[in-house]
């Protein structure tokens, strides 16, 4: 579940159009050093090598098709083979335009053993599980198997009988085995379970128009080599957020091992509840969205929205769109599903999403009782047919009167954030509650936020999404067109290596806490931004090694709409060049309190640590050229070392090791640049460094940004 905030201009809901552009590839990340006397050092960060495409047409079987079992029950009707009992079924050979159907008992466990099988279908899901307790699809050792859904026209959600995946299961589905499975869907999803979906050991390649992997209740990847491509939707997706009868929370995506490479037109991982990544089995995750995903097509124009005033929305009714052409050929009914909240000023609207292939020129809307499949006559209200407006991405219902739906086309956009980001959601990892990373090697290339946790939206379990991101281990490298890591709630880094290589705003959250880890951040607006939310904005650094870099000009390396507190760690700030206003090295609305650790802040001076902080030295007007620096005491002991990659003319340094009456030097490549005796709590240049503080809410300059 997601939340949009929009502006009402000239009678239309506007979401600013944003062209996807490749991020500046010349910016290099910094990898932090663990020593408390050393700042994070700049170095190139590269992802783990992508998987080799396992597709091998020469291995695809042309043998005669067979399905055998010793303890089950299977029948054939033409090229459709139906399994009706628990057991193991070995499937091999080529089944052209055929289908494997499982329609067994509620508690039956069915295993499909793929032994060099090739299954294609142009009319339905090639592997369809209508009913069973649990189904396992296993690839036998060293075998090569393909499942191809060759239906055309795009999926319709008009009824429960829409089996919208190449491998579709109405029950728990497990994919396992030490062979290879190639899944292709030109229709919609690649592999889908209405319940839980898990993958273990298998070499799996999925290419789909819709989601590559979808488990309505959960998706779990334990091991294997997975190459997942969605050319017009998400890579991995979950849908439900309620609690099962056994007390299990639904909606989580879990990755604990193997290598997972995802290429997605929209979000690489989209969880209705949590995303949890650990390193139980050498976990590697490489994520690419939109223009970074070479096989994806532009998603703009494929996902459309129906905007419904809250007074015209009820869970007792459902909206459908009928897409058709004037040639009298059969059209398609598509269900409009809740996707987001849209706000115009203080007016709330429900944003319902539907997907169209773009091949239809006309549409009409139907409102039907919940659970009813529309047929064009059983509606409560309907619109007259009209032409699709290809230049707009949403239709706003303005009234329903005497059974007639009326409205107009509008354009949705985020209205804030980076203009290089996409107009639709194209995040690396997105969760409606929390993102929890305890291990693994994770690389993200996203034309939107790298990691994003939504907060505040109502979940089906009765709670509101927390919007938290917690990193306690692993290695992350993030290149993003908007925020590197965004948390509507709390962003906490306890350990691990985090490199935000390129971003609009590097780390953004309501409450940001850094307890440890090796962290480097580059943001072309703010490096770190503690911004408005449900709690008072706060940035706290208790430990770790951190380097934050922003380009010269109107930028803040550290920006807090509240306070900034530091009790430990080593921090190097390389910020904007303006001073005494809204840009610089550290810019806060409240106060800066440094009670421990080391921080050197280069760039425009907006604020300095408050009285009662550790001793601070301030320099204004000194030339600090690019190079390697060491801060030493009178005995020559190195207290702090760091590197500047460009020149600065002002800085402040706060250090718990500064002692009143003691002398210190700052040396560049062995040459003294500064020397002083610390005779007071604040030594060196003085002045009123007040400043205006933070730049507004999430995503940019003034108010909440459009976040999906």
Task: State where each predicted segment sits.
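A composition-driven surface/loop motif
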Residues: 4-14, 18-300, 414-708
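Insoluble glucan recognition modules
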Residues: 211, 288-421
